[in-house]
Amino acid sequence: MRFFYNTYNAEKQRGIMSHVNFSATQNSISNSRVYNSETGGWTTTPKNINGNWNAFGMFGFNTALPNKKYTINSFSNANYQNNVAYLTSGKGADAVERKNTTTNLTLGERLNAAYRNDWFEFGLNGSISYSIEKDKLTPDNNQEPYTFSYGANTQISMPWNMTLSTNIANQSRRGYTDSSMNRNELIWNAQLSQTFLKGNATVSFEMYDILKRQSNIRRSLTAS
């Protein structure tokens, strides 16, 4: 199920956008693991399970100030995930299979402000994301991590059709049970581009993570 609403006032350069989405999966597959006392081994069987669903919502607003050279925008979002799976705890004949549920609520907000004229643009931005992660059967996995960042960007357009743009942001992670993930990263990117052939061709030189501070970390929360 999805719902969209968008509107834009060209005269005021003001726009609103919103989006709500809900999805649920019927008869998902989860592996059931049962101990066989006769053989001393385990039997793993795929079984249907219900309870996997996700809800997402976002709201965005952007507008120019009266002189049209300054703009501000805001982007808010919320996401809730409910995951289920069969989980076996215990050893041997004492093993018990139960239905486990993990939930993850994430709230986010991003703000931007910018100034621009014919040849120069400068912007400031900040964002925060906060999560509540819960595991019903293994509460030691529960945590409430959050990330926040703040930075600036600029772009200069030169008369000979050359453009220099750069952005820098300090990104921070906190609240993780794994202390190695709680860190600060200063990320700096830059790009130089030249347009020629009457605007029909462009050559760009781009540099990402110039300070070599960014780490590639991906996390997933499952019920199994």
Regions from the PLM with identified roles:
Residues 1-224:
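Exposed, low-structure sequence patches enriched in small/polar residues
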